[in-house]
Amino acid sequence: MIQQESRLRVADNSGAKELLVIRVLGGTKRKYAAIGDIVVCSVKSAQPGGMVKKGDVVKAVIVRTTKPLGRADGSYIRFDDNAAVIIKDDKNPVGTRIFGSVTRELRANNFMKIISLAPEVL
């Protein structure tokens, strides 16, 4: 469960290292984001020479959370960190590589490019 002021690791090579969630998209009453949801973030730390700079406001999709995600078959999956991938307005990632595993729930939200770039889909 990701909410406002949550800090996320960046799971791509866009140049950002850490994000701060400004807003969870999807309605005025929406408080929490889970895997596959889009959030508006501020870049809190970045690598020099990257595609995004510190202070930039970007959109990102959540790819990993420490909160267990329940599946239809009764199993749960959770990760060691909260991570996101910075995306453009057309849902394609800004970076060209994805680090770490992602879940197959991203396929239902049409993030096919992220799934194809990821080294492992759980």
From Swiss-Prot:
Transmembrane spans: none
UniProt keyword annotations, A-Z: Ribonucleoprotein, Ribosomal protein, RNA-binding, rRNA-binding
Swiss-Prot/TrEMBL GO biological process terms: translation
GO function term, MF aspect, one: large ribosomal subunit rRNA binding
Pfam families: Ribosomal_L14
GO cellular component: cytosolic large ribosomal subunit
PROSITE patterns (alphabetical): RIBOSOMAL_L14
InterPro entries recorded: Ribosomal_uL14, Ribosomal_uL14_bac-type, Ribosomal_uL14_CS, Ribosomal_uL14_sf
Subunit comment: Part of the 50S ribosomal subunit. Forms a cluster with proteins L3 and L19. In the 70S ribosome, L14 and L19 interact and together make contacts with the 16S rRNA in bridges B5 and B8.
Role according to the record: Binds to 23S rRNA. Forms part of two intersubunit bridges in the 70S ribosome.
Family of the protein in this entry: Belongs to the universal ribosomal protein uL14 family.
Name used for this protein in its record: Large ribosomal subunit protein uL14
Organism from which the protein derives: Finegoldia magna (strain ATCC 29328 / DSM 20472 / WAL 2508) (Peptostreptococcus magnus)
